[in-house]
Amino acid sequence: MREPDFLNHFLKKGYFKKHAKAVLALSGGLDSMFLFKVLSTYQKELEIELILAHVNHKQRIESDWEEKELRKLAAEAELPIYISNFSGEFSEARARNFRYDFFQEVMKKTGATALVTAHHADDQVETILMRLIRGTRLRYLSGIKEKQVVGEIEIIRPFLHFQKKDFPSIFHFEDTSNQENHYFRNRIRNSYLPELEKENPRFRDAILGIGNEILDYDLAIAELSNNINVEDLQQLFSYSESTQRVLLQTYLNRFPDLNLTKAQFAEVQQILKSKSQYRHPIKNGYELIKEYQQFQICKISPQADEEEDEFVLHYQNQVAYQGYLFSFGLPLEGESIQQIPVSRETSIHIRHRKTGDVLIQNGHRKKLRRLFIDLKIPMEKRNSALIIEQFGEIVSILGIATNNLSKKTKNDIMNTVLYIEKIDR
């Protein structure tokens, strides 16, 4: 394909109609270098001001030389370029988060409203297959979106309908680490896909077709349920369990950066069914608020965050909090380590007591206020006591009492341990 063909596609799709400034994520690979060439050549036709952004991951000897070459390229094209260096322990997830945080900083600094990436159809196939193998939710198998609004910016992926073989061979940098199978995506690209294509030579097309079909269903359900107020629990619970799940998943699409896991989604469902009033952080700066027959999910305001005085601990993580070291699923060594059976399926909330708190003991629900009175706990200790909560229920009041589930229930639900060590403040 020729460059004008790509321009015509961009114009037909109207990718940049709403944008005057766009930031291009420039890695130096063939796909991003060709996208740079098309966008820089046709800035006038597309009516955009182009800004370049590059992250030097510092993982290869060639990285610094490539950075210098990209600076030269930007200077020759008379385009601004912003560069940041990755630091810390490297992983695919950390590098991705670092890149997108940096790109958003560049956009704020320059006033750009669009972030353009060079993801193409081959990336889409790899992404869908990765998510399928990991067992992600069905709606995420639609893959990467062509256009995606996140807050006040729009991410545009104009190459998503093209394969890498559609791009002409132009000057670019080859990342030799892509040939290694250390990372999951590389194993998908180098090993799994070639084997699957032996069984079905059109396997890539089949995967893309499934992704598009799931996207169609997702959009259709959103349109058909547009007049249903999912936040009205009386209305939501009037439908079958299956329909409730689908409606709730569609509702969660309103929050693209929330990304609940299956276990977290199940936890939200359980809270909506079992709690009359509830207010807790759930993930990525969002909180779930339930008041009788109504609920909502919204961003936590700084004031609300301070009032909650709460920490959320995820599986395989540790945190020092209020004089204790909490380790979720990672054993601690020592003679004074407290161990509490918990589930690895969802996060743990560590907080202070709230009005209406209840602990289940011997199958009976007991208000914390009454428990503290019965145990003659001093007021100062009541106010400083740390509550450990999971699945919306109190698991333990640290150093005071625990939820003594039956042995069978413990075996069924509790499949890991929260380790707690007293430390100097």
Curated annotation (Swiss-Prot):
InterPro entries, per database record: Lysidine-tRNA-synth_C, Rossmann-like_a/b/a_fold, TilS/TtcA_N, tRNA_Ile_lys_synt, tRNA_Ile_lys_synt_N
Lineage: Bacteria, Bacillati, Bacillota, Bacilli, Lactobacillales
Binding site for ATP: 27-32
Name under which the protein is recorded: tRNA(Ile)-lysidine synthase
Reaction(s) this enzyme catalyzes, per UniProt: cytidine(34) in tRNA(Ile2) + L-lysine + ATP = lysidine(34) in tRNA(Ile2) + AMP + diphosphate + H(+)
Gene (UniProt): tilS
Coiled-coil regions, chain positions: none
One GO CC annotation: cytoplasm
EC annotation from Swiss-Prot or TrEMBL: 6.3.4.19
Recorded superkingdom: Bacteria
Family assignment from sequence similarity: Belongs to the tRNA(Ile)-lysidine synthase family.
Record carries keyword Oxidoreductase: no
Keyword annotations: ATP-binding, Cytoplasm, Ligase, Nucleotide-binding, tRNA processing
Localization annotation: Cytoplasm
Record PANTHER family: TRNA(ILE)-LYSIDINE SYNTHASE-RELATED
Domains: entry comment: The N-terminal region contains the highly conserved SGGXDS motif, predicted to be a P-loop motif involved in ATP binding.
GO BP terms in the entry: tRNA modification
